[in-house]
Amino acid sequence: MDIPYIELTATDRQILNSYALMLDGLGAYLGEGYELVLHSLESLDHSVIKIINGHYTGRKEGSPITDLALKMLGELERDPARTVSPYFNKNKSGALLRSCTIPITGEHGRIIGLLCMNFHMESP
């Protein structure tokens, strides 16, 4: 059984849907070297609601949130003033990534989702 992490309002869902549309444009603009992932915190077991270039990590819509994204979420929740800054990471095959995790705030000022951007450093 899928246990919700948070309950989303209709407005929260509308906010996340607007980000999903933005991902299409960002993906077209930035190109194949970028993986863009939109997470909804309504269900951590199926948090990925939109993904562009998921072939780099093998993720798809309906995939669960990663341990790293959960760690970043915890840091963002503990320190709301924390600025978003890029960091380096590796995917499962060991390829170097430059990543950024951006919190998405909903109707009541709480974090309802995450926008994760991963640039694959070995991309042409």
Report residues per predicted region.
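Generic alpha-helix detector with strongest preference for long hydrophobic helices that associate
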Residues: 3-7, 17, 50, 54, ...
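Structured interaction and signal-relay segments at domain junctions
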Residues: 25-85, 90-92
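Juxtadomain coupling helices with adjacent low-complexity linkers
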Residues: 1-29, 113-115, 119-124
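Residue-identity detector for threonine
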Residues: 9-11, 57, 66, 83, ...
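Sensory/regulatory domains in signal-transduction proteins
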Residues: 72-124
